[in-house]
């Protein structure tokens, strides 16, 4: 027995001595003095190295992902991946540290700067009679790699009008004989002769012949009741318009737009079958001007233009007009502001606090009359913004390549929304048993909807998941998916009947009121397929009744 113990101790001693004799070292199998990644998200390089001891790898840069991050002695392939696009003008660097038993070897990784076109301004206005204008920009592309073209035949680019040295595009706008303004986009694309990549765009708005100012404000703040609720508490929706002249109110244009907006809001399930729960109002807003370039409009709306679909407005003015309605509950109100413009844009704001610092359901959705009153894009974007974001507080389900992996700060922000019962259509786990829509994954009644766990949402490519490949909260071209329909249904019952619902209650309702799977193709030249939509904004400010 003593001999066995002595033998065991001898083996331990020899083993300990052997480990001490092995010094930590790294042997890199290729040149690492210059490790460069392309500017695109998910750009990757792999380096091979051998370590004589256990090792770990780390970096303090959020944009660089390392895999694997540790290992035992041996030869490894270390993948270095850019989690997001470098859309700045300058390259960026990260330090990767290989660590083993007190030894640290550092590697410098550089991500190249993206090709860019930077505009002096993103929106230009021109008068109805037409004329010339200059679009100024800077770029790091050579002349043969950059193409510039317009989406409208009324905007022409004379031969030899582009100045290479000065980065100026000279344009001519033909006269606009219509009363309404019209919009065109100028696209700046990188080309390799076969494919084009959109880098930036300019929005050009030409005024119509009816550009003037209002003189009669007598109908301002007039309230029109469009619908009284026949079920529940009567959830308030308030419609109002920005950029409408007194003459457009007098001739019935304003009321026509408000009526159409109301009908559009109830074109998708489940709100289509829950319409009786809503009180709907229209408040007349007389704007001094029908232009959004700094002239006075009732709500001071401005559109960012260019690559952005962002709309900003004066929410205090919107709230003032809401409170023209007698006995309305401001904190339960969905306000929809329709802009008197054909531009493709839309933005929603929520996260307003009451006097007790409690978050409320108040939301303000801004949406132009996209293209025209009967255009499908107007309906789709209005439903996406006002119903999806404004009423149900759903998240966006689309993603952009340049955004890469969702950062921890964004995850925290979305989880905060979920603590209020919002953002029920996205999650951060792939666990079928715990994901927010796990019940649908196990329900054979929803097999035809292909509900699953699809990576990419909240504008980010990875680290966040959505329920379906496409939906109203993705491309806007089809209805709400089942988890979103449930979120909307639950919201109506919670606020309209002061009660919680069960999964089975919803499925019974849902099957009795099936959602039509509408799919509409879009013109390839449409700006909607290439321009980023602004995410909803959590305002985080107090408002008082």
Residue spans of the language-model regions?
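Bacterial Sec-dependent N-terminal signal peptides
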Residues: 14-34, 101-108, 112-118, 201, ...
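Solvent-exposed, low-complexity, repeat-rich "mucin-like" stalks and linkers
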Residues: 19-22, 29-58, 120-147
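Surface-exposed binding patches on compact interaction domains or structured appendages
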Residues: 34, 46-79, 141-170
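A short beta-strand micro-motif common to beta-rich folds, especially ectodomain repeats
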Residues: 80, 88-102, 169, 180-192
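Propeptide-to-catalytic entry region of secreted or membrane-anchored zinc metalloproteases
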Residues: 210-327, 503-542
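Catalytic zinc-binding patch centered on the HExxH motif and its immediate surroundings
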Residues: 291-293, 320-330, 338-366
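Short pre-active-site segment immediately N-terminal to the catalytic Zn-binding motif
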Residues: 360-386
